[in-house]
């Protein structure tokens, strides 16, 4: 899937799942930095859309019930699950439109705040 198609799918999915436009944009920007919007890319810095590593990557594999690359929708659902269930990411939900991306980058991008 081409990067523009991934971007469009992500924006649509995130908006349908109650992300504000600035939160959805922040998620797309983060995925672009992590993977170039390539959902199945693997590198030394991480795997798949959000370059998951370590225990987060293992948790995603369990969530998706696959050791290989999960589908894009599954990766988005897992990211959503992480963001909504981990108290460390609460700042993202309360961030102003100009702070949503920096907060997401600092916390979610590193897997912790």
What residues fall within each predicted segment?
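Catalytic and binding regions of secreted/periplasmic enzymes and modules that target cell-wall glycans
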Residues: 42-113
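Hydrophobic alpha-helical bundle architecture
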Residues: 15, 21, 38-42, 64
């Amino acid at each position: 899937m081409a990067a523009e198609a991934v971007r469009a799918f992500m924006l649509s999915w995130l908006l349908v799942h109650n992300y504000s436009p600035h939160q959805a944009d922040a998620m797309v920007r983060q995925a672009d930095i992590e993977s170039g919007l390539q959902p199945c890319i693997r590198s030394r810095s991480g795997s798949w859309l959000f370059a998951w590593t370590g225990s987060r990557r293992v948790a995603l594999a369990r969530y998706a019930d696959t050791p290989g690359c999960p589908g894009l929708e599954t990766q988005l659902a897992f990211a959503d699950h992480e963001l909504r269930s981990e108290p460390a990411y609460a700042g993202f939900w309360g961030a102003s439109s100009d702070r949503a991306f920096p907060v997401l980058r600092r916390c979610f991008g590193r897997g912790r705040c």
